[in-house]
Amino acid sequence: MSADRHYSPIDRFLLQADSALRTLLPFSGQPARPSPAIVEPDGELSEEDTRHIAGLMRINHTGEVCAQALYQGQSLTARLPEVREAMEEAAEEEIDHLAWCEQRIRQLGSRPSVLNPIFYGLSFGVGAAAGLVSDRVSLGFVAATEDQVCKHLDEHLAQIPQEDRKSRAILEQMRVDEEQHSSNALAAGGLRFPAPVKLGMSLLAKVMTKSTYRI
């Protein structure tokens, strides 16, 4: 990671383009860790449950697309090298989540959201803008975003039946990782966002969840 700070602007543009393709193209994200679902048995699910779980996993997959874009945008504009490296390391960890969710969506007979490119572009812009303001704001945005993700994961875990141990194992590990990302961002000096800002972020997140559940 440390060599990354010596890349030229063209090199960094190419790296960003490569990251976007790996995030958006099917089966292109290669996880560093195996999916937690591998060791879990298949459960008996009704057709209705299968459709609902696929919709929830599609939301989570799009959430990871947004996280990738957010981190990449922030790493592009981060001022301090250590902050840039922290963003890039977090993005690498999110690749695991991205791949795990896609694998599970396919197993459930569905596909990722067709809206992913739109949300990637929007999230990349937000991340880059946050980085331009300050590294402290950028890190604070990470913490607030990951807190929102944890809430969504808790809501989804409450809806997924115990019989679907594969999906539950994925979301449980994701929650552990996301909580750690939030803690790391605050420990690195991230700004604690006030409640009104978090409320606005929550309302925007609902737009994503409502739209990607089915498409």
UniProtKB/Swiss-Prot annotation:
The UniProt annotation places Fe cation 1 binding at: 64, 94, 97, 178
Identify the CDD domains for this entry.
Answer: DMQH (cd01042)
Q: Which GO terms describe its cellular component?
A: plasma membrane
Pathway assigned to this chain's UniProt record: Cofactor biosynthesis; ubiquinone biosynthesis
Annotated InterPro entries: COQ7_proteobact, Ferritin-like, Ferritin-like_SF, Ubq_synth_Coq7
Q: Which cofactor does it need?
A: Fe cation
GO biological process terms, alphabetically, are: ubiquinone biosynthetic process
Per the record, membrane topology reads:
Peripheral membrane protein
Coiled-coil segments: none
GO molecular function, a single term: 3-demethoxyubiquinol 3-hydroxylase activity
Give the reactions, separated by semicolons, that this protein catalyses: a 5-methoxy-2-methyl-3-(all-trans-polyprenyl)benzene-1,4-diol + AH2 + O2 = a 3-demethylubiquinol + A + H2O
Residues bound to Fe cation 2 are: 94, 146, 178, 181
What compartments host this protein? Answer: Cell membrane
Which free-text remark accompanies the cofactor? Binds 2 iron ions per subunit.
Q: What is its EC number?
A: 1.14.99.60
According to the record, the segments passing through the membrane are none
Matching Pfam families: COQ7 (PF03232)
The entry's keywords: Cell membrane, Iron, Membrane, Metal-binding, Monooxygenase, Oxidoreductase, Ubiquinone biosynthesis
Which NCBIfam families does the UniProt entry name for this protein? DMQ_monoox_COQ7 (NF033656)
* HAMAP family according to UniProt: COQ7
Q: Which family does it belong to?
A: Belongs to the COQ7 family.
**Role this protein plays:** Catalyzes the hydroxylation of 2-nonaprenyl-3-methyl-6-methoxy-1,4-benzoquinol during ubiquinone biosynthesis.
Protein name in UniProt: 3-demethoxyubiquinol 3-hydroxylase
Protein species of origin: Pseudomonas paraeruginosa (strain DSM 24068 / PA7) (Pseudomonas aeruginosa (strain PA7))
Cite the source lineage: Bacteria, Pseudomonadati, Pseudomonadota, Gammaproteobacteria, Pseudomonadales
The primary gene name is: coq7
